[in-house]
Every structure is written in C-alpha cells, then in structure tokens.
Curated annotation (Swiss-Prot):
It is found in: Cytoplasm. InterPro entries: HAD-like_sf (IPR036412), HAD-SF_hydro_IIB (IPR006379), HAD_sf (IPR023214), PMM (IPR005002), PMM_cap (IPR043169). It catalyses: alpha-D-mannose 1-phosphate = D-mannose 6-phosphate. Pathway: Nucleotide-sugar biosynthesis; GDP-alpha-D-mannose biosynthesis; alpha-D-mannose 1-phosphate from D-fructose 6-phosphate: step 2/2. It comes from Spinacia oleracea. One of its GO terms (biological process) is protein N-linked glycosylation. Its main location: cytoplasm. This is Phosphomannomutase. GO terms for cellular component: cytosol. CDD domains: HAD_PMM. Mg(2+) 1 binds at residues 12, 14, 207. Catalyzes the interconversion of mannose-6-phosphate to mannose-1-phosphate, the precursor for the synthesis of GDP-mannose. GDP-mannose is an essential sugar nucleotide for the synthesis of D-mannose-containing cell wall polysaccharides (galactomannans and glucomannans), glycolipids, glycoproteins and the antioxidant L-ascorbate.
C-alpha cells in the first residue's frame, strides 16, 4: 500500500488563481499542471461549479485532485462528485423567504450610484448578495469596488443583516468585488477540510485572508498553513519557492 500523501496545496479561485471573475491564463494552467506533478492540488471557491468552470475551464474537476464548489458543500475528488449539502433543506422555506424579502427591501432603499440586476443569487449551499447586482459590466464592477472601499456599502449591510438574523446562525463573508456570501455557521471554506483528513499538511493560498474576508476562516484554521497572496502571479511565485525550488 502506498504511503498516504503528506502535503496538499489548496487554492482559492478569485484573486488567487485568476484575476477577479476573469478566466485563468494559459500560464497558470501550465503552472498548476507542473505543480500537480509534485503535490496533490485542490481548489476551493465560494461560487458554484458552473462559475468555477467559467474561470478555470470546463475540465476543472479533472484538472485538479480536489474541487470544492460553494466552499466545499459540493465536493469533487478525482473527477467524481463525493458530497453535496443543501441550504434549503437546513433553513426551510419560511426562513429563506424572510431573509430574502428583507434583503431585497434593504437593497431597494439603498442609495448607490448605479444598480443593475441579479441582486440575490440562490445557490445550493449559500446565498450571494450583491448591492449593485451581479450582471453589471466589468467596468461597473471596478467602479463599485472603489466606491465600496470608501462608503463601506457591503460591510454596513452585513452588520445590519447580522443583527437582524442573528438567531439564524448565519455567517456573512465579503469576497470578490461586488458581493458577499451568506451561509450557515461552519459552512465557510473550512467545510472543505473534512475531505482532506488524509493529509498531514494543508497549504492554503488565498487573497481575502483578512478577518471578514471569505478566505479568513480557512486561512486561520489550525488545520492549514495559510499563505496570503496578492495576485495570480504572486501565487505562482510563492508556490515556486515552497514546492518547486530544491532545498539545499
């Protein structure tokens, strides 16, 4: 019997393997292929598999040893689905409607420069909330991100929702440029770690590793060795130093 693999490299998607909401570059695909020859490689994203595939390619579940969509609530190993969890089943329809109705009313009364469409996206394991609306253009995304850094639209909204729905035991996690994720406590990216029990050392790479960011919980977990990256280029640089540079 082969010895169990000791180390795995686990990556966030947006801002880590790709620029925010952009497709992966050929350079990164080639780099991941080379890295996978040295260590098992996994990806964990807040988006569903469709959106992850749009960024990392249609063969993503075969290009990595593990793919965790929706923070690991939908899990794939060696190209096959191994588990799926449902937010609807956990919360129930009445609680979901209460949360969604309040959130839409809050956004309707929000005074921001522009609004587009798809303010709430219901996923299998989470709700994604975007004050500007997810179908805005890339230029509008960039502008909202700058505006939000000054006006704190998302963090203010999260504070209101956290107070209003504290009894729902929800976690609110700001990620990307225009939105934040809402999911049951414990259903953050650390959820994916239950599928990596065979590994002694889990190196996690992410860009939103600050408290409140959607990489924070897994970055800070005692189960992982956390690495903060600033771009896909920085990810490749750090991985080269850690995994691909021969130590004397």
């Amino acid at each position: 019997m082969a010895a169990k693999p000791a180390i795995i490299a686990l990556f966030d998607v947006d801002g880590t393997l790709t620029a925010p909401r952009k497709e992966v570059t050929p350079e990164m695909l080639k780099f991941m292929k080379e890295l996978r020859k040295v260590v098992p490689v996994g990806v964990v994203g807040g988006s569903d598999l469709t959106k992850i595939s749009e960024q990392l390619g249609k063969t993503v579940i075969n290009d990595y040893d593990y793919v965790f969509a929706e923070n690991g609530l939908v899990a794939y190993k060696d190209g096959a689905e191994v588990a799926i969890m449902s937010l609807k089943k956990l919360l129930g329809e009445e609680k979901l409607k209460e949360f969604i109705n309040f959130t839409l009313k809050y956004i309707a009364e929000l005074d921001i420069p522009i609004k587009r469409g798809t303010f709430i996206e219901f996923r299998n394991g989470m709700i994604n909330v975007s004050p500007i609306g997810r179908n805005c253009s890339q230029e509008e995304r960039d502008e909202f991100e700058k505006y939000d850094k000054i006006q704190k639209v998302r963090s203010t909204m999260v504070s209101v929702l956290r107070e209003k729905f504290g009894h729902f035991n929800l976690t609110f996690s700001i990620g990307g440029q225009i939105s934040f994720d809402v999911f049951p406590r414990g259903w953050d990216k650390t959820y994916s770690l239950r599928y990596l029990e065979d590994f002694n050392e889990i190196h996690f790479f992410g860009d939103k590793t600050f408290e409140g960011g959607n990489d924070y919980e897994i970055f800070a977990s005692e189960r992982t060795v956390g690495h903060t990256v600033t771009s896909p280029e920085d990810t490749m640089k750090q991985c080269t130093e850690i995994f691909l540079t021969k130590k004397e």
